[in-house]
Amino acid sequence: MRPSQTELWLGLTLTLALLAVRWASAQAPIYVSSWAVRVTKGYQEAERLARKFGFVNLGQIFPDDQYFHLRHRGVAQQSLTPHWGHRLRLKKDPKVRWFEQQTLRRRVKRSLVVPTDPWFSKQWYMNKEIQQDLNILKAWNQGLTGRGVVISILDDGIEKDHPDLWANYDPLASYDFNDYDPDPQPRYTPNDENRHGTRCAGEVSATANNGFCGAGVAFNARIGGVRMLDGAITDIVEAQSLSLQPQHIHIYSASWGPEDDGRTVDGPGLLTQEAFRRGVTKGRQGLGTLFIWASGNGGLHYDNCNCDGYTNSIHTLSVGSTTRQGRVPWYSEACASTFTTTFSSGVVTDPQIVTTDLHHQCTDKHTGTSASAPLAAGMIALALEANPLLTWRDLQHLVVRASRPAQLQAEDWRINGVGRQVSHHYGYGLLDAGLLVDLARVWLPTKPQKKCAIRVVHTPTPILPRMLVPKNVTACSDGSRRRLIRSLEHVQVQLSLSYSRRGDLEIFLTSPMGTRSTLVAIRPLDISGQGYNNWIFMSTHYWDEDPQGLWTLGLENKGYYFNTGTLYYYTLLLYGTAEDMTARPQAPQVTSRARACVQRDTEGLCQESHSPLSILAGLCLISSQQWWWLYSHPQQPVTEGQASCHPPVTPAAAA
């Protein structure tokens, strides 16, 4: 019997209602039974609070006595509405400085699924099989293999007993924040969905010359893994992962982020932002932790990594991808926050990255920007071995200088105000490990970071179809009129605006030296009418430029003719240093202290000198105090010595 018209209408109405609920639940925050709470008097106060309101105190979020992780067993594990009762109770307690009920955060691994390709027995991206590779062999031939450096892979766990990983595995650099135990071993499933972290780990630190798989870029570095993507992901989980053992771990590598769907605008929560800040200010005994991030795989959806608050943070070093042929991969996101590029693959016939895989296996199928970030992390480990005193900002300066346009193909290569080529696809180009370690050895410490905030718009202003907002910057100086910033590093634009179709709005910024950087290009799939709420865009394209002069923000409607919007707030944020960085040599230089070197190699690098710690301008130095003394007394003579700094080694000898 055919259903009546009324039954059809009822069925259709019910279906639409269910779809609406599903859509709403996908868009709305999902609250969980965990709270982050900041109290005034540490652990005892957190315990009192937990007992008073029926929480379980799961301990500190950061290694101090302020932020705590509380869970309530009487609250639903997942809900579309916050628990207002506990919210009111915590709000009324005078000892609670801040609290937040946690929500699930959608994070995706930045790998790609491709059909089976033939096995590639050679690692073409670092063994000179192609003319312009990552120049890893040059660093290895100088005896640099990552020894003494610790890297942690923040992902879905690593197979710690893998034949190519166990010798370098570091339990202190590992933890499981999904199950809260010390074992980061991945959860095995029929389709091996949790292979991502193990693959990233092998790129960095797979053991060399053991007759298995290939060699990691830094094959003597210690490697750890944090299991944090295989379960409920909250701000607490992310913050704790990024704060694990900050005095032990030198580099955190992350190949994940918000969805690369061309619609999402999302970034770290308050706790994760605090974890980044603490990492760069307190990590590595104050030198600053290195956070290496994959730029994203949303190219097919015209996504832009400046809509990802992890890759566009000033505290992370964002890495893009190129193919063996030097082309832009189909998944690559073009954005102004990318620093540098390493290899991955493009179409399915392209050679991919060789690395470790689950079940004690090897693979030649690792790809996406997920594969690019760990290669960069390994190269930075080589630089840290060459010079352990480098700060997080030193490394960013070095990466800018050690990246080469090489053979990379793109239509948007431009020369910025200080003569460097830069691209939204590749940043400053393909990272060169040999050049990176050469520069690291002779790098003088970067002077302190300065910040200049200029509020440009603070009253509602209608957005025209094409709108330019000029601002002449002359006030980046202190009370004595000394210039705070002479050379730029990061430039941020903080915006609050409404727009009828967000993805149709292109935003760009032009510097006083004429460099135009696209902060966000059109995103056709982003039909949101929410605009940008206090969102921060970032560009690396003005590195070392002089900030003084006319800055111009541009907003242009690239889509529907009748789009309308309002600009509520615009602040220009300039970061940099008082030093004129353009006066520094752009390549390694041998100074007048060259006589302190006892023996040099064929390339003129010092091999025999005063101490096994590091070389500065062709000279080995014993301590950070000696480093700073030489920096302050450049004309003083130095006594010669005879100890070896970095004797050359082959991978076979160093394995």
Curated annotation (Swiss-Prot):
Q: How is it modified after translation?
A: N-glycosylated. Synthesized in the endoplasmic reticulum as a zymogen, is matured by autocatalytic cleavage between the prodomain and the catalytic domain.
Q: Which parts of this protein are propeptide?
A: 27-110
Gene name, Swiss-Prot/TrEMBL: Pcsk4
Q: Does the keyword 4Fe-4S apply?
A: no
Major localization listed first in the record, in broad terms: membrane
List GO terms (cellular component aspect): acrosomal membrane; acrosomal vesicle; endoplasmic reticulum lumen
What name has this protein been given in UniProt? Proprotein convertase subtilisin/kexin type 4
- Return the InterPro entries for the record: Galactose-bd-like_sf (IPR008979), Kexin/furin (IPR034182), P_dom (IPR002884), Peptidase_S8/S53_dom (IPR000209), Peptidase_S8/S53_dom_sf (IPR036852), Peptidase_S8_Asp-AS (IPR023827), Peptidase_S8_His-AS (IPR022398), Peptidase_S8_Ser-AS (IPR023828)
